[in-house]
Amino acid sequence: MNTIDIELKKLPKDVLGWVDYEIAVSNSYDIPVKLLSKKHVWIDRVRCHGYFCSTTPELVVACYMEENEWVQTMVHESCHRDQFIEKTTIWNKKIELDEEKRDPLELMHSWLEHEIELKPRKLKEVLMACMNIELDCEIRAAKKIDEFYLPINHKEYVQKANAYAYLYHILGTTRLWYPKGKSPFYLADVWTKMPTDFDRDYTKIPTKIKNLMLAKCYNKRV
């Protein structure tokens, strides 16, 4: 049921043990794992390095890159799988729109594509629901990195995770994903300015961080 394009036996022992564990957990819930020899994959019209899809279901990671990069992606996406199999409230949250209960990620993508319009209060509800899914996932991922002694810099991971979480506030201003090569969690002059912990109020974005991300990721003068 799995598609493994990489040579797992060449991985460091700790990483191999963890990858085998994640494959086993996924398969125990009838979720295939695809570790593909690709630089990127697509989901919901968005190009990315990996994803977990609950409707298919499948856990997919593009592995044609440095090991420490795709391992980080797999950590993150495996935590989305954990949210799904644990049936967490955050993962299962629906938002009412026009008397229908809708998936917040679906609503966000439709809004970004200008397929629907959302009033300011509803837009914030949608974006915060999406951010909460990712924030919970990142907190889980940071714990998993420590638990399995994965070769990932914990401090840097948390900083990049915070850049990702704050991005959802930025989307409400730009109505655009960042341009190619302008990801806030890859631009060192952005993510290195992020907090090194998750102990903060994510319902709002600090002005300095907002201005930094708009300037560096979207070339917007502030």
Short names for language-model regions:
Residues 68-69, 117-135, 139-222:
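Long, well-structured alpha-helical subdomains associated
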Residues 1-54, 66-67, 127-129:
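Auxiliary, metal-adjacent structural segments of Zn-dependent hydrolase domains
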Residues 1, 55-61, 118-123:
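Glycine-/proline-rich flexible loop or hinge segments
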Residues 58-74:
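Short pre-active-site segment immediately N-terminal to the catalytic Zn-binding motif
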